[in-house]
Amino acid sequence: MVSGAGSSGTDLQVVNTPPGAGDLDAGADCGAVLDVTYRDFSEAHPDFEMPFSGDVVRRGLVASTLGVDHKPVFSDTVGHPALKDSPTAIDPDWSPTVPVITSAATFNQWYNTTAGVNLELSKKLQLSESAPGTGLFGYDSSAFFPLAPSEGFGITPKGNDLGMNFLFTTEIHVHFTYGRGQKFTFRGDDDMWIFVNGVLALDLGSMHGPAEGTIDFDAQAASLGISVGGSYAMDVFHAERHTRGSNFKITTNIACFVPSVVK
């Protein structure tokens, strides 16, 4: 477990909301409901429920910019340890050796619907305001199983003692308008990569316990190439790859997201 792999974001607070987003009405184009593409996998895929050790965030598994298809680009099977209190920097003091991704070919299947490998399901995820008028929105689940045991490949891994559908990926594409003071905090497991304006803004790769990181848009504006008042893409990629926990928490003071369609 690596809490604080990024900055803590403790100035943002949000109440818990029930796990599993369900199929909600998105309403207006601009709001706090996120369109989500889930892809369900079985344990037959070599990157899911794979043997691993270390249980820490690995960075550098994906490239620092999105591909032309608006998907993460594979970079490395092993990666590098995370530098504490940074959303993307690596710790140069030690180097892991155990692979946590099999190959570029297997990784390419994570966020691309592939016959015989994964099953795609579209749902919605509702961000709820912590209290009326606070401007703080979030989603918080310590049992994040958006796919029912009857959906996709069903209960995976087969016979897991929780009887839940693990082993899936999460993909979200939105636009937002950048205003001063905005932050976006994620805490959960396993892999999480968030790109802003096509640039990697939060890197929490690999299989690990709940790890947290914060995108501070003001502090990262120059590296992300963003300016106050501009509209920018945010592309979110998550993977739940290993039993036996599944955590997913978003906390943000961005109130308005516009869904983006990526073909």
For each of these PLM feature ranges, what is it?
Residues 12-263:
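Acidic/polar, compositionally biased interaction segments
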Residues 1-8:
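N-terminal Sec signal peptide cleavage junction
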